[in-house]
Amino acid sequence: MSYRSIILLVLSTLNLVYQQGLIPGVVVTPAPIDVPGLHVLIVEESGDRNTVDKGQLSVLQTTLVKQEVVASGGEYRMYDANEPPVEEPWRTAMERPRTSLPWLIVSNPGKGGFEGPVPAGDGAIDATLKIIGGLK
């Protein structure tokens, strides 16, 4: 078996493991935004930035997440929970249920989706990029 075949097998296995939700803390669901392509939405309460976890705050303040999404040909938005957008698909995405803030929605029909709290703690930016990277 060639190295290329082994690498493809490993990558396929990792993709399957990721999509089956076998990586702790990451559950891939059907894409929550029914529009082709990668879409990433962060919902926050901007008035609470001084009380959110430092890791979550780093995700809210960094440009790395947006740069990664845009470089992948996707669309990125961040909205305040009290400031609903008018344009689709963001308006519909903002209407989805959430249990806390800040909240992350990653969607790519055909590849799956993620909805959950913005990762917290040390490595929050890397964890966010990992979620997005698995759904590109």
Features from the language model and the residues they span:
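Sec-dependent signal peptide recognition
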Residues: 2-9
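Domain-start "cap" segments at the beginnings of catalytic or binding domains
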Residues: 3, 15, 105-106
